[in-house]
Amino acid sequence: MKFHIRLILLLAVSGLSIAAHAQSRFEDSFSQMGVGYEVLKYSFTGGTITEGDFKGIPYSATAPNANSLTFSAATGYSFLLHPNFLLGLGAEYNLIDSKSSSYTISAAGQSGGSQFKQGSATNWVSAIKNQDYSVYIAPGYPIGLDKLVFAKLGYASTRMYSGDGEYDMVRGPLVGLGYKQVIADFDWIIKGYIYGFAEANYIKYGNVYTTDATGSYAASATNVRLGLGFLWK
C-alpha cells in the first residue's frame, strides 16, 4: 500500500513538473503573411500661399479617406520571459500601395489661374502611400501551448507621393492588438507549426510641411488583418 501511495505521489509531482515547464509554442522564430483592409485619413492645418500669383492668400485643404486592401509580410522572434509573458520582436512590410486621394485646395474669394478658379475648390494633387514598413515589439500573454493574445508597440515609416512625382518620408508610432492560435503541425521537409492570426493596428504619421505655402498635413492609418504564419521548430 505504501508503495502504491508513493508511486501515485511521484506521478502527480512529475505531472505538475511537466506542466510547469511546458512552454508556449510561440516561443520561437516566426514568419507570417496577412491580408486586410486599411483606412488612411488626412488632416490639414491650412495656411497662406507663399509663391506665385496667389502669394499671401490664405487657403484651406481637405482630402477624402483612402480605403485600400493590405497584404503584409512579417518576420521576427518571440522570447518567453515568464510562463505568462512572451516578448516578440518583429519587422513588417506592406506589399500593396494605398489608393490615391486627391487634395482639394480652397482659396475663397479669388479667381485666376489653373489651380484656383472662381474662388472655388479645385483638385490640385493626389497622394499615394507606398514602401510601408514597421518594426515593433509585441508583449504577449500565452493561453496554454497554442494560443497567444498580444499587443504591438512600434515605429512605422512610409513614402507619401504627390501628383508631381515627389515624395516625403513620414514616420510615426504604431500600436496594435491581436490574437494568434496554432492550427496544425507541419512536418514535411521543414518542421514547425502553422498558426492563424487576427490583428488591428493604428499608425499616426508625423507632419509634412508644404513647400509653396505655410501649414502642413498629416496622415493616420487604421487597419485590420487576417493571416497565416509559421513557427519554426
Named regions from a protein language model:
Residues 1-27, 233:
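Cleavable N-terminal export/targeting peptides
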Residues 21-233:
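Gram-negative outer-membrane beta-barrel domains
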